[in-house]
Amino acid sequence: EDDTSTVSRRLALTLLVGAAAVGSKVSPADAAYGEAANVFGKPKTNTDFTAINGDGFQVQVPAKWNPSREVEYPGQVLRYEDNFDATSNLNVMVTPTDKKSITDYGSPEEFLSQVNYLLGKQAYFGETACEGGFDNNAVATANILETNIQDVGGKPYYYLSVLTRTADEDEGGKHQLITATVNGGKLYICKAQAGDKRWFKGANKFVEKAATSFSVA
């Protein structure tokens, strides 16, 4: 009887273990091939972004943004914006240049000073002693938060993060991310932005992904 009882307990334990194994899902750490719980299906795609292939460039645009016909900058060839907030948008500009590399413009800061029309007319860089932080002849202030230089496909790219603010700005300012490079006698610039309030409510991840995804062919 003891032997029979022992066998019964072992059998019950085996059945329980088997049931637990069947009911559990494959975790990412346990999935040897494919994706978790999707081993035999199609790979998952990032539905938050749409790949755009332009003339000589490609970029990932937030899927919920739509194309816009508004032309805001010289050489603009692409514009997408958030339907619910046009302050959140992406622009791609392509203009002729005699430079062989983006580094021929100088440092990222020096480059930005040569294309400061991207930040708004009469943008002022730095701090002012005037009340409200604005110079009498400036309609906007621009503070460079971060710059970076990276090599992508053998070409140097400039990345800049800039916070602009105007006297009548109700969003608290705009976070503007700029990616720039030179290829084949052309200057390529991608600028993605969002208002300060939306930036800290999650818009930053969409703007950052879009700006850093930009590359030339």
From Swiss-Prot:
According to the UniProt record, list the residues that bear Phosphoserine: S107
Coiled-coil ranges (or none) = none
Q: Where in the cell is it found?
A: Plastid, Chloroplast thylakoid membrane
Keyword hit for Thylakoid: yes
| Plastid keyword on record | yes
Q: Which UniProt keywords apply?
A: Chloroplast, Membrane, Phosphoprotein, Photosynthesis, Photosystem II, Plastid, Thylakoid, Transit peptide
**One GO term of the cellular component aspect?**
chloroplast thylakoid membrane
Which Pfam families does this UniProt record tie to the protein?
PsbP (PF01789)
Q: Which GO terms describe its biological process?
A: photosynthesis
Matches recorded under SUPFAM superfamilies:
Mog1p/PsbP-like
InterPro entries in the cross-refs: Mog1/PsbP_a/b/a-sand, PsbP_C
GO molecular function annotation: calcium ion binding
Q: Where is the transit peptide?
A: 1-31
Family, as annotated:
Belongs to the PsbP family.
**Job description of the protein:** May be involved in the regulation of photosystem II.
Return the protein name. Oxygen-evolving enhancer protein 2, chloroplastic
Organism listed in the record: Brassica juncea (Indian mustard)
